[in-house]
C-alpha cells in the first residue's frame, strides 16, 4: 500500500479478495489484478479479461512476502494498518504511509512544521555523542533552533513554553550540546499534536476517504497527463458523459483533455454546471446517461458518505442504477461480460422493490470495521503497572477515609440527638437514673474533658479523645446544639496557656467542671448533693473573695481558706440522694452566677446577687470541706503545685486591691456592683480595661425565667480568667505607679463620697486626617491615656497624634502637642480632650 501514487505491483496475488464488493466472474479468479487506470481496449466492452482487470480490488492488498507468495482463498485477512492509526499517535507515526498522509493533512492546515520539528528532535537524539559527530550535532542543533524556535511567529515557537526556549537558547549559545536538550520541547509539541491536530486528522475527509478506498488516497493523485499507462496515477471515476457526446477512452487524446479542463477526478466549476441537472433530479435520470466506471470503484461521488458513523463501501453505480430503475423502465441487472442487458422490467412493484434491495445488498454496501475516530485513547495508557497500581491504591484509600469520616460524623450527630432526647427524659426520671450515669468517687483528672459538655443530669461515660480533631468537632457540635444563639466559649483548649506548672491537668479539670450548674452545690444540706459549688467554682470564688473581702479578712486567713478549697476541689463525692427536683434547684439558683465573671466581662445574671447569697456560698464552702477524698501521691503533689501557684496569684491580687481601694468605701461600692447588671455605666472602681471590654462584649442571653428547666450556659475557664486578670492587674499596677500621687488619688476619692453616683465622663473629640468635622465620643473617667485613645480609632495604621493644651509659648495661648507614648496621659482643654490624627506618609 503506497499513497504516493505508484500503484501496486502486478504480482500482488492471483486469488480474489474475499471482502471485495463484487466477486469475480466464475472462472476468472486466477487472472492478474490490473492497476492500470485506463482500459487498454478502445471499446465499451472489450473482453472478459479486460472487464476483470478494470475491476481492481484493493481493500486488502496481496503481498508477496507471505508464506505461499499469496494469501489462500478463505483465509482471514489481517487488520489494515490504516485502522491501527486511530489507536494512538505512535501507531500513526510508526507507519510510513501514515506519516505521509498525516503530513499532507498538516500541510492543508498550515502546521506541517509541527511534525517536521518532532522528527528533527528524534533524529537529533539518535545521533551518537562521539567526537566525529560533535560538529554535526552542533550544526544540527543550531539549524533546529534557528528554523523552528528562534522565530517567535512560527507555529512551533508559539507552542513551546518560554522557559523551554530559554533553556535551548542557553545550550546553543554556550555550545553545551546535549542529546536531550530538545526533549522538553518535543514533549510539548507532541502533547499539542495529541490534543489538537491528531483528533482533527482522524475526523478529516482525507483520512476517512483513505480508509474508504482501502488504502488509496483519492486526493493525492498524480496528474493523469504526466503519463498514462505507467501506473503512476491512481484510478478514479470516469469524467461526466454529457448527452449527445461520445466517451473518448483513447490515451492519445488525454493530453488535449487535460489542457482543456481540469483532471477528471477534480471538482471544478465547469463540471458542477454540467452535472447540475443530473444532481438535482437524481431519481429521474435519463437511461442514456448511464455512468460507466473503471479502475477503483471506491471513490464516492457525493460527500454524504464522508461523515457517516461507519465506513461503508458504496457500489455507486449499482446503487444509483437501482434507484434509477424505481422511476423508469431501465434494467436492474448488470452483467460483467460483453452481452447487453435484456431482462424486461418486472410487472409487480412489490417484487421489483424486493429484488432491487437484494441486488443492492449483494453488489454494494460492504461494511468495513468501525473506525473510532471520536474515541480518544487515555493519555496515561503507557503508565507502568506498578506506578498505576500505587496511584490507584492511594486514591482508593482516600475515598475510603472520606467515607469512613462521613459515617463517623453521622453516627456522632445521631448520638448527640439521642443524648438531647435522653437529657429531657433524665430530668424527669429522678435520682435512680442519675445514680447509674454519675461516676463514683474518683479524682476529676481521670475523666475526659468531654464531661464539660454535659449537665449533671445527662453525664455518661465516654472514651477519651484528648487530641483527636473529631472529638473537638463533637464537642463543638454538642455545645452549639445545646446553647443555640449563645456564644460558644472554648473548653480551655484554645484559651491562652496559663503559667501553671501543671496547666494541662488543670485545663482538663476546668473543662470538666465548666458546665455543672452552680446551683447544685449551693444547698448541699437541703438536697443531699455533695457536689458543692465551692468545689465546682473554686477559682471564681477565690477571685470573688479577694476582690470583695480583702480588707475584711487577714491575709493568713485568706490563704488558709484558699488551701482548704483547693484540696476540696479535687474530690467528686456522689450520694444516692443527689438530686432534688429540677425546678426547685433552678428556682433557688437564679442568682447564683459568680461575681468575678461580672468583673471580667463574662456575666450571666449577676444583677440578682446579694450579700445573702455570698454568705450562703461561704457556708456551702465550709460544708464542702467535710467531703474531701484523698488521692494518690502523684495527685497530692500535683495539687500542691497548683495550690502554690494560685496562692501566689492571690497575693498579687490582694496586694493590688489593698493599694487601690480604701476601706471606707469598699462595702458600699461592693453592694452597688452586686445589685447592678453589667452595662456601660460602670462606677469608677471598675478598671479602664474592664470598661473597655464591657463596651465590646456581646452579652449572651439565657432564658432562665422563661424556661426554668433549661440548663445554664457553660461557664468560661476559671484558670484562663485568673491568668488574664492577673496580667491586666499587673499592667494596671505598673501604669498606676508612673502617675503622680494626686492623679492616682483623685479618681478614688469620688466613689468614697457617693457610691451611688455614676462615674464622670469626659468628652473626647478628634480630627481624623484633615477632615473638617471632628469625631466626638464619651470616655469614662477623667484620665485617658494615648493607648486608650487609640482604641477609639476605627481605622488602624501609622499615625501621629496631637492634642490641644494651654501654653504660654505662643501668642495664641494654645498649642497642639504631639504625644507618642501609650502610657502618657492626654491633656484636657476646656473639660475636653481635643486631638488631631495625622497619617504618616
From Swiss-Prot:
Boundaries of every RGS domain copy = 88-211
Q: Which Gene3D superfamilies match?
A: 1.10.196.10, 2.40.240.130, Regulator of G-protein Signalling 4, domain 2
Protein's GO biological process = cell development; negative regulation of canonical Wnt signaling pathway; positive regulation of JNK cascade; positive regulation of proteasomal ubiquitin-dependent protein catabolic process; Wnt signaling pathway
Q: What is the gene name?
A: AXIN1
* SMART domains (alphabetical): DAX, RGS
Q: How is it modified after translation?
A: ADP-ribosylated by tankyrase TNKS and TNKS2. Poly-ADP-ribosylated protein is recognized by RNF146, followed by ubiquitination at 'Lys-48' and subsequent activation of the Wnt signaling pathway. Ubiquitinated by RNF146 when poly-ADP-ribosylated, leading to its degradation and subsequent activation of the Wnt signaling pathway.
Question: What is the protein's given name?
Answer: Axin-1
A single GO cellular-component term from the record reads: cytoplasm
